[in-house]
């Protein structure tokens, strides 16, 4: 399965403490789109968070997620490269790719 398109929607927060940097939509093989991947700045650097929902007991469960670490790394690297391409001023972010 190939990544054929990545769309980044940067979040401009008025709250300087906001950790959410962007929402991402990834297209696979020009036939499947995965929306609402988040780019988040955490204590250990920037990472992606997969779409999730809150359960009745208040836990968050991923709706979809990579099965293997290799694919997660591929997905994250592709998203980070596109994020930096669109936002070159954010090069100082600690991106792991």
UniProtKB/Swiss-Prot annotation:
Any GO BP: sporulation resulting in formation of a cellular spore
Tell me the first and last residues of the signal peptide: none
Database matches in SUPFAM superfamilies: SpoVG-like (SSF160537)
Looking up InterPro entries in the UniProt record yields: SpoVG, SpoVG_sf
The lineage's top-level taxon is Bacteria
Is Acetylation among the key words of this record?
Answer: no
Any single Pfam family the record assigns to this protein: SpoVG
**What is known about what this protein does?**
Could be involved in septation.
Q: Which family does it belong to?
A: Belongs to the SpoVG family.
Q: What is this protein called?
A: Putative septation protein SpoVG
Give the organism, scientific name.
Borrelia garinii subsp. bavariensis (strain ATCC BAA-2496 / DSM 23469 / PBi) (Borreliella bavariensis)
């Amino acid at each position: 399965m190939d990544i054929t398109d990545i769309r980044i929607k940067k979040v401009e927060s008025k709250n300087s403490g906001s950790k959410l940097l962007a929402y991402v939509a990834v297209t696979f093989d020009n036939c499947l789109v995965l929306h609402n991947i988040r780019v988040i700045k955490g204590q250990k650097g920037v990472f992606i968070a997969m779409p999730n929902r809150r359960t009745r007991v208040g836990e968050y469960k991923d709706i979809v997620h990579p099965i293997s670490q290799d694919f997660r790394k591929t997905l994250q690297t592709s998203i980070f490269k596109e994020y930096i391409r669109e936002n070159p001023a954010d090069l100082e972010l600690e991106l792991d790719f």
